[in-house]
Amino acid sequence: YKGEVIYDKAFGLLMPSREGHRQMVETGSLYDLASITKAAATTPAMMLLVAEKKVRLDAPLLTYLPETRESLLGMVTIRQLLLHESGLPAGINFYTDLIDDSSYEGALIRSKSFAGGVRLVGRAWGNPNFQFKGDFIADQPSKTHTLTFGHRRYLSPSFKQVLLDRLFSARVSSNKSYRYSDLNFLLLQE
């Protein structure tokens, strides 16, 4: 407050290490914020829009995104999106829309190691012989590939519509109990 720390405490335990040890959280503990950005940026923006009466928490999504009118997604409320009670799946593998299926043989991802395969995470092995679709990914920036996607990889802004089309057609469960979903915040950003 006014340049002074007024509360500096730490609680809980960190995730177990590979050796299985759990360490107490300290005030100097570091965290990976990779996935929290969506919530940390979107939630305050939504709070501001609600305070300005530009968004109503209990309004269905179709109020703000008419393209959701024809699906169950249109009936999901802003409140349900914020509380992860939308019925949306945890995520969608959008990367599959970026990869040219004809550029590799066999499966893209397998559950067992195979000759030439690259270990991804856990028991997942990837086929490194794939190519990205040129419509969406390029090795050099250009008028059509303006967004930095990775090291020497540039994404076309046109991919956003592919992402939104997949999102708008996602299956919405009638079970509205808590289930974390990255998709909620992607929708709220729209």
What are these regions (language model features)?
Residues Y1-I6:
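Short, glycine-anchored, charge-dense loop/turn motifs used at functional sites
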Residues D8-A10:
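Residue-level detector of high-confidence beta-strand sites
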Residues G12-Y180:
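Active-site-proximal loop and beta-strand segments within enzyme catalytic domains
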